Amino acid sequence: MFYICIWNIFLLFGCAKTEMLSEDNTVTNGNIVSTTGTIAIETEAIETEVIETETQDAIQPSSDQPPEDAPEYKIIMVGDVLLHTPVEESCLQLDGSYDYDSLFSHTKEEIAAADLALVNQEVIIGGADLGISGYPCFNADYSLCDSLVGAGFDVICHATNHAMDKGRAGLVNCAEYWRDEYPQITVLGIHDIADTSTSCGADPAIIELGDMRIAVLNYTYGTNGISLPADMPYAVDLLNEEQVAADIQRAEELADFTIVCPHWGTEYRLTSDASQEKWTKIFAENGADLILGTHPHVIEPIEWVTDEASEHEMLVYYSLGNFVNWTSGTGEGVANRMVGGMAEVTLTKNDNGEVEIADYGVKPMISHVTSGPEGVTTYFLENYSEELAEENDIVLQDSSFSREYCVNLCDSVWGDLWKTE
């Protein structure tokens, strides 16, 4: 209650007058609306009265005001950072060091703008002491970690068929460098200590976006026939049905939304294969929400999959292709390897407080390769002109490559889902 004192002196020849004023005052503040009560005013000759007004004891929400929009968070992922020898050479500096920043110079702004940015780090980062190398046994300099972080990536997926290319030393060097230099970065798929592996009882990685808890898992089909160290059976997260099911179920207990990043499929195939379909079913049955696939080195379709028993829906990106590469292959189909995709998925909460996908799509990316220092980089297709396409040295390996070729490939594989803005 509040009080308003009004001093009124009315000389009305001894006559008293009483006046009642009823007024409905509505005050709006965001979604809150309050209505004042009746205001009573009394006046008497040569007298002073206190006028009292009452407000409602409780402020009630308006039934006709829309609720505030739930926050949205954008997740992006790009495909394989595949450092063939000419890619490494383009990043070699005059003093013998390596600087990989040029690979990300045309895409880092959008990568950094995402709320959560993931990348498939195809090759192990074992450091220069083990020898920098391209295909078939890859190894990158530690400075690649610096460039990945500088580009804005938050999650590094290392479970690939090349994780053991430099043996135990390469994997341990890579894991230690990430942990020592960038503890804020989530590194998935490889382990130099058992404590970080779900196969040894660790919980899945959980990332918080506002009030959302996002679990992210990363697996590979294999390691090119290279055995894991006998004393480190946990070194690489492999696609094992029992382990994957347990991991996803645990993730569902701990998180609001589960992402799985599998390294799977058939190289250079533009459609999913039987193995991918098998694993998709397993992921859906156990409650995964989003699949972001890599390994084929070309783009593959995007589709919703529904588990028949639970009717749970899951969005699948079968393959994001290469983020950057300079394959040594020649002939028909090589041009396909120069097209990759940035998955774009927006999450929000529905009226029940459940995290769901509010929007999704994909932005095509082009590996642009030319000889010389900093001659290799990646562009979004929307920024890639026909003139740039003509300068791309990949035309010497596959003459069919052109901007139009890339557009037609995206249309063929992704239909209307690919975005240019």
Regions found by a protein language model. Give the residues of each.
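N-terminal, intrinsically disordered, polar/charged segments of Gram-positive cell-envelope systems
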Residues: 18-74, 93, 100-101
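Acidic, metal/ion-coordinating pockets
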Residues: 57-421
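Positively charged n-region of N-terminal signal peptides that target proteins for export
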Residues: 1-4
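C-terminal motif of bacterial Sec signal peptides marking the signal peptidase cleavage site
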Residues: 12-14
